[in-house]
Amino acid sequence: MAMVTARQFLASAAELGSGRRRCGGGGACDMREDGGVEALMQCQRVSDLLIAASFLSIPLELFYFATCADLSEVKCAVLHFCAFIVLCGATHLLAAFTHAHPHSAPLLRALTAAKVLAAVASSAAAVSLLTFIPKLLRIKVRESLLRDKASRLHRDLGLVRRREEATSRAVRELTGRIRASPPDAHAILRTTALQLADALGLHACAVWMPAAGRPHDLVLVHHLTSRPDDAADLLLEVGDACTVAADDPDVVDVMASKVAKVLGPDSALAMASSVGAAPAGAVAAIRIPILRVSIYDGGGTPEVTEASYAILVLLLPPHDAAGGWSSHDLEIVQVVADQAAVALSHAAVLEESRSMRDRFAEQHRALMQAKHRAAMATRAFSSIQSAMCHAMRRPVHSVVGLVSMLQHPEADTMRPEQRLAVDAIARTSNLLSALMDEVTVNRQHLSVQRKPFSLHALIKEAISVAGCLSHCGGAGFLHQPECALPEWVVGDERRVFHLLLDMVGTLLNRCNTGSGACRLSFSVRICNVGEERYSLDWIPMRPTFSGCNVCVKFKVGIGRSRSCAIERSLPCELPRRSAATTSSQMGHIFSGYFNKIVQMMNGNMWSASDSEGVGESVTLILQFKLQQGHVEASPPYIPHLNGLRVLLADDDAMNRGVTKKILERLGCQVMSAPSGAHCLSLLASAEASFQLVVLDLDDRAVPSAAMDRFEVALRIRELRNSCWLLIVIAVAAGVVATDDGGAVQELCQRAGINGLVQKPVTLPALGAQLCRVLQDN
């Protein structure tokens, strides 16, 4: 401030002196010197303005930085410094204005006041600097200390990162090698010991595992040591000779913790790991879990297994004994042990999956063998069943043919009871023939027909057969027919008759009929749909017919005396229950065949018995559609073919005789041949004069037969004297029913066959077929 005042004083003196020189004594002025002084004054004015602007901007900068930082410790010094700077700036600003108005009294007073205040502020600022400068120096020292600490932290952080990278790199390498080892627990533990010894420069490494059959001992299974004279590592397989107690304090301590433990030099585990000698370096140990997969039994309950651990013991070389185990080394050991545990768990899973796969393969082989045996048994059963059915079919066909002649006698001389017996025999024979066809041909084509039939006639014939079976077995019989039953209904009469006979046969087989103390009862009545709804295990019927329906309840029961009920003992008895048993639960009484038929007919079937076993009953409820209008049952037309010369070729003697009788009944002149070759020889003879040939040849009946019916027909067409003959063949009904592709018709056209008659051959069917063939040709 004193320098500014001196500069202003010198400027004023120079101005006065220059005025004198310019004007001289006579008042004359030099205009060139006047211009230089003016320039200097203008320069001073600009300088004062710039200095004032600079001084006044400094407090603004200080205020800005004061808002960004905490300046509470130097607040007083900063205020003094700001006041000093502001007053200095004001002085320079007023000095700049004095150059334009040098003789203004207010301006001079203001300039004087500003200079005085600036002098006071400068003195106060100078005093404040005595305390401000030491504080500023302390801040600088703290800043340097913080910078040193930051640099050390940065170095430590870099070191930690490098150690982490080195650790992760080592762990990745060890993990990769461990996972690349064979999936076996011993191979994984061996690889772990080898890789840790290589990575940490170990003197020795040992692996202890629980002894098999001795849960209180640990056995040394792997031991790795390095020889001073050999750079290579030697792996020793140690047997049961090296053991350590599982209750050793060091073993218990290692087993109880997940982290690695540093063992003392006098530790029994450390001495045993160094194979008897005192350990030369520091020793560390860590547990490795040997995970086992839970084995589940058939019920799904897991088997409880205790946790099992292996112990990995690591020994440092003697020259590293002073340093010991660092936290970094222990961390590597712990991470590698965790990875080894994961690898062991994977190996356990693979071993379990391999064993399960082997068990499944063995079970699959056993299953395939059982399947093969079952298939062979099924084929054998089917062959036996087909052979039995084929052996029974021809006698049954003969019986059906004979009964058809009895049903249509030349003179109606039969009494009603005889007619009923013949009709019952015919229905039973037809049922047996149809069942054999279903077993052998239509095994997979179980169907239910819906056509009108006489319910009264069906019930009469069923009662007749049931009474006959009861009397033959020595049991009594009682029937209660329902008079209000409809005459004609729509349904499958053959299936209904079959079910009724099965009910009767089931109860008669369960009764000791030889004692004469049993009585069979048969009743039929109309019932409502919801009548049996509240009985146990009731399966409601689903109405499928349209129009008027009727529900018919068939009930067959057997009554026994108490002595017979006590003596009766069967290996498979009805359940002693008073309530009903549905058809789905009666697999031990009725086969699935009957259950399926009942379901297809939209019915229900169950059995019941009393608590004492005296009475049993089987109930069948079926739903029929009423036939609208009266159906006239016209008798079939029996033609009379007078003088028709027929050659019959049949390889079964009984069937040949029955068919011959049927043809003679139709008025034909019949000559029979026992084989196809005999038939061809008769036709080839010159005296043969036949008009029609009936072929009923079956190659299964006579295995040595060289020709079947189609081949014989082809040979007949090749004969010159018999190429015009009419040929009729007899085929099984199931063959025609299942001939979807028309293979039989195609064979008939190719062989020149004029007609087909379905077995069993009956009088009406054969007469109708012969009439059709004669009319067509």
From Swiss-Prot:
The chain crosses the membrane at residues 49-69, 77-97, 113-133. It is found in: Endoplasmic reticulum membrane. The modification 4-aspartylphosphate is found at D696. This is Ethylene receptor 4. It is a multi-pass membrane protein. It is an enzyme of class 2 (transferase). Coiled coil: none annotated. InterPro entries: CheY-like_superfamily, ETR, GAF, GAF-like_dom_sf, HisK_dim/P_sf, Sig_transdc_resp-reg_receiver. Its EC number is 2.7.13.3. Cu cation binds at C88, H92. It catalyses: ATP + protein L-histidine = ADP + protein N-phospho-L-histidine. Its cofactor is Cu cation. It comes from the Eukaryota. The modification Phosphohistidine is found at H390. GO terms for cellular component: endoplasmic reticulum; endoplasmic reticulum membrane. Binds 1 copper ion per dimer. Keywords: ATP-binding, Copper, Endoplasmic reticulum, Ethylene signaling pathway, Kinase, Membrane, Metal-binding, Nucleotide-binding, Phosphoprotein, Receptor, Transferase, Transmembrane, Transmembrane helix, Two-component regulatory system. PROSITE patterns: RESPONSE_REGULATORY. The gene is ETR4. Gene3D superfamilies: 1.10.287.130, 3.30.450.40, 3.40.50.2300. Residues 184-344 form the GAF domain. GO terms for molecular function: ATP binding; ethylene binding; ethylene receptor activity; metal ion binding; phosphorelay sensor kinase activity. PANTHER family: ETHYLENE RECEPTOR 4 (PTHR24423:SF618), TWO-COMPONENT SENSOR HISTIDINE KINASE (PTHR24423).
